[in-house]
């Protein structure tokens, strides 16, 4: 179909591959196997210049959210099959997106190429909170999949540490990370999907010994307490920016499933930390 290559539509493969590892039912992984085989055997010739009017531009990881959605699937397929084609494809495509969207001065990811020359109200570059949260979350999934002695792991581990070191500097005094990482004054409301993914990543990093506990624990504790404050008595998580691509205003009434997912990922790491 027209979404055969689309990262958002392969992300569910992560869950099915995890289920296959638990239940050993081949029916759980065959659709993901077929899809990844097709993508690798028929690589897209598209550029990384995202254009929603051109579906071909969505065939590659041309927006930073995609680095959460698709690469972990290929990492898991590599570990399940021991077939190098999966890790070679992931490395090639991930590094192409990194080279294109990662700003080496700010050490943050642009959401996509449309933001290269845009500026926030305060004159800074546009770096989206949730977008960088997606990247950090995806790196966690890759690092949890590739063993520490795997030759392909170092690039992702180094990037995880670099991005974590930068992101900790951008936490608000209220404990949240905001929709705009460099212009929080223009978007002062909490944003819990970005905060959830970031707390998840930083907690994972500390738990795995990748990040210095003394340096990162204060930010983790502030971030987790902030997330808990955003939960209503009925369990609803508020302040989740709706589906989008750049910083927007957020209200307490706003919620989305990916925000809850990020909260649960963070909570899982906090629980491990407390045990």
Residue ranges with predicted function:
Residues 58, 72-84, 91-92, 96-100, ...:
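Active-site lining segments of carbohydrate-active enzymes
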